[in-house]
Regions:
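NAD(P)-binding Rossmann-fold cofactor-contacting core
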Residues: 145-172
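Short acidic low-complexity segments
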Residues: 172-178
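Structural motif
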Residues: 129-130, 155
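N-terminal ligand-binding/catalytic initiation module
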Residues: 1-105, 113, 123
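Short internal alpha-helix immediately C-terminal to a glycine-rich phosphate-binding loop
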Residues: 107-127, 134-146
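Short acidic/polar capping segments at secondary-structure boundaries
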Residues: 102-103, 133-135, 142, 157-161
Length: 178
């Protein structure tokens, strides 16, 4: 019997470790895949719906669905919400539905770290992260998997946010400073 699995952002974070994701991307990105241009549909109130399909022969089929509601900030809600649907590549059965915020942040950070692993000098010991948003901490955690950074500098337009992020990262054991 087949049952569709659901993974919350917390479950994605728990199960999707940075080192393993970097290695999965190293293997997966080396293989051809089909990733048509995303579809973007205009919704009322200047909102949008985006569809981003991807599939790889012999593997799965996925589609990320994203809504963008710019007015949500006034409601205390995130402007962007997303899910990722995974289907079996052999028979098309739905396998899983994942909240996509954590998935996207980790995939983006790990893709960046993978690129740095190929492009940065092996003896690189300093990392600069520009920005203090959601992605910044993920960038530090992922990049620290590919290099032994001795200095991690955080820069942001708001010095207080940069300092707070650096402090949080130091609590996690990273040599971060604003």
């Amino acid at each position: 019997m087949h049952s569709l699995r659901f993974f919350s952002n917390a479950e994605v974070a728990e199960r999707l470790a940075y080192p393993q994701l970097i290695e999965a991307l190293r293997i997966g990105l080396a293989k051809p895949c089909s990733a048509p241009l995303r579809n973007c549909h205009a919704l009322p109130a200047q909102a949008s719906l985006l569809q981003m399909p991807v599939w790889q022969a012999g593997a799965g089929i996925g589609v990320k669905l994203v809504t963008v509601f710019p007015g949500n900030g006034a409601r205390g809600l995130p402007a962007v919400a997303a899910v990722f649907a995974l289907f079996d590549g052999e028979d098309g059965r739905p396998l899983a539905l994942l909240e996509a915020s954590e998935l996207t942040a980790r995939r983006t950070a790990c893709s960046s770290a993978l690129a740095a692993d190929y492009l940065a000098r092996d003896d690189a010991r300093r990392l600069l992260v520009v920005g203090c948003g959601t992605l910044a901490a993920h960038m530090v955690r992922a990049h620290a998997c590919v290099r032994d950074y001795r200095h991690i500098d955080i820069w942001g337009r708001d010095p207080a946010k940069a300092a707070a992020l650096a402090a949080r990262l130091r609590e996690e054991g990273y040599p971060a400073r604003a």
